[in-house]
Amino acid sequence: MSGVGCILGIETSCDETAVAVLNQRSVLSHEVLSQKEHSSFGGVVPEIAARAHSDFLHVLVSKAMGGAHIGFSDLSAIAVTSGPGLVGSLIVGVMLAKAIAYVAHKPIIAVNHLEAHALVARMIYADLEFPFLVLIISGGHCQFLIAHDVGRYTKLGESVDDSLGESFDKVARMLGLGYPGGPEVESCALKGDAHRFPFPRALKSRPGCNFSFSGLKTAVRYTIAKEGKLDNQALYDICASFQQCVGEILVSRIANAMAAAKSADSSISKMVVSGGVAANNFLRGSIRKCANELGFDAIFPPQELCTDNGIMVGWAGLENLRKGNFSSLELIPRARWPLCP
């Protein structure tokens, strides 16, 4: 097949090793390797993550290229997550992408991991035009943005302490659940009473678009200590109450962000919600209901595209390719890379 317009996307920002080949019409192949080694530690161990990327990334690239039935010479560019993320993990992806680009004489595109989350919905929803509101809720980030165009964003608010994904992971660890914590807490919450424990809703009634989750996390810790040895029902109720609290915090902040977005540009009527936490079904329902009541369309990528993946990196690469945004082989991965200067 012709490889004109094909792009290779490489994602190694944290603990998922992911590679995809796609063009503007379809995903030709996608390979993901999740690192189970971290579960016993209750979180990601940077050294283990980097070593696993180094061991398996080249294998996934070969499988993805074979699955797409093309060679490196057929690619239009190589897109690679270059930040933000764990620098040791990022280096593995960037170095292999540089090697492929150099040997195949192809341009390289440095992809911002947050922009990849923000833009992937445009691959699924062809009618999603700029500008739109974005809520990124992931393991390392929690922020509202207005997406004006590829590479052009305005930040409306962010977490002033912990990210939402980190909070889910830490609550799961306190309760002796597995990693990643989000799916574990969500599963337990289905069997719990969401109103048993009145956890604090930080900033809920205040103006602005910032978040705070550290107080909620502390309240969960105190509740666990107060309850002593937890039976299954108490554990389920803590998970349900925590998740309910998170939903209410998000809804209150979303209302403020939508008002701020409308004030900035009255044409904005859609909000993309992405990042790993956006895969949570309860939160998706709460956010969708809130958005509908406020006259917005809440747009969620499929759940498999909310968590880290190579498809979103490849798509962000295509968006930048159309803009002529290329990087040099001297690009350096960045642990911190805000979308808004």
Swiss-Prot record:
UniProt xrefs under InterPro entries: ATPase_NBD, Gcp-like_dom, KAE1/TsaD, TsaD
The record lists substrate as bound by 136-140, 169, 182, 280
Tell me which Pfam families the record gives: TsaD
Binding, Fe cation: 113, 117, 308
Task: Please state the Enzyme Commission number of this protein.
Answer: 2.3.1.234
Q: CDD domains annotated for this entry?
A: ASKHA_NBD_TsaD_bac
Q: Can you tell me which family this protein belongs to?
A: Belongs to the KAE1 / TsaD family.
UniProt-recorded name of the protein: tRNA N6-adenosine threonylcarbamoyltransferase
Source organism of the structure? Anaplasma marginale (strain St. Maries)
Q: Which gene encodes it?
A: tsaD
